């Protein structure tokens, strides 16, 4: 498995600033660090009595989710509101798309209503890239998750969580455990960790839930024995089993998966004593993680949600700024 081809010029303006946020593939380390630093500065906003800054005042953010979501959609809404933007969240099940209107026509109509940023989640890999390149290139397009391909804001909020608790990435061992085959979060995390200089990225899963070619594509170490893979790691990122994307025969049973790969208190002892426990949600307790671990002292799962708002504020504000700068450059060139 190789990542979708990096489209660096598509994501960045002529000055190298973010204008769309579609994937972490091909983005330079300096830009990922800038996103993390910007998000760090926005965490203070969440502690204020009035949780608002005027960076997107007068702008409209459209959340267009073709897949169900709670955390991602809600945190994007909060992020946009804290930046003082107007927010529209499209309920696809009751929208014109359910009456036969194409994705292309739906988005072009929203663009005609003077939207400035689209946050799009779609079941098809590459949907956000297609929209940014062929449908609405003059708007800032943010990928809220596309098929198995990418979930870049989740990847970045996970990196912010790790950095705030562990500091630099250069001496860390990070294990990603679970359904790697169907996980866009795993792909974004592997890319982010590699770009930020993490020297030891471990992927732990049954062989039936491992894509082919992970080692070559992402520079990771692959383990099919959880006990071996978790030894002395600094961070454990658990992933749920995505039954809705599976075909029959990939797993004998959820009980068997929990026995061999579930993160229990006993299995967590194989990691370093201060290892972080992370999970992008939704959590399936007793399937990939024990409740005592999910709610335990090493868990930073709720911190991930908090940091997600700050990361999405950073991405929204940076993409809008980069898109505005490109428009100005285009106008100057036209004159």
Curated annotation (Swiss-Prot):
Gene3D superfamilies according to UniProt: Aspartate/ornithine carbamoyltransferase
Sequence intervals crossing the membrane: none
GO terms for cellular component: cytosol
This protein's UniProt keywords: Pyrimidine biosynthesis, Transferase
Main EC class the enzyme belongs to: transferase
Gene Ontology biological-process annotations: 'de novo' pyrimidine nucleobase biosynthetic process; 'de novo' UMP biosynthetic process; amino acid metabolic process
EC number(s) per entry: 2.1.3.2
Record: residues binding L-aspartate: 99, 184, 240
Residues that, per the record, bind carbamoyl phosphate: 71-72, 121, 151, 154, 281-282
UniProt-listed InterPro entries: Asp/Orn_carbamoyltranf_P-bd (IPR006132), Asp/Orn_carbamoylTrfase (IPR006130), Asp/Orn_carbamoylTrfase_sf (IPR036901), Asp_carbamoyltransf (IPR002082), Asp_carbamoyltransf_Asp/Orn-bd (IPR006131)
Pathway: Pyrimidine metabolism; UMP biosynthesis via de novo pathway; (S)-dihydroorotate from bicarbonate: step 2/3
Reaction catalysis annotation: carbamoyl phosphate + L-aspartate = N-carbamoyl-L-aspartate + phosphate + H(+)
Superkingdom of this protein's organism: Bacteria
Any one GO MF annotation of this record: amino acid binding
Record has Transferase as a keyword: yes
Alphabetical list of Pfam families matching this protein: OTCace, OTCace_N
Family: Belongs to the aspartate/ornithine carbamoyltransferase superfamily. ATCase family.
Record's function text: Catalyzes the condensation of carbamoyl phosphate and aspartate to form carbamoyl aspartate and inorganic phosphate, the committed step in the de novo pyrimidine nucleotide biosynthesis pathway.
Subunit annotation: Heterododecamer (2C3:3R2) of six catalytic PyrB chains organized as two trimers (C3), and six regulatory PyrI chains organized as three dimers (R2).
Protein name: Aspartate carbamoyltransferase catalytic subunit
Organism: Ectopseudomonas mendocina (strain ymp)
Gene name linked to the record: pyrB
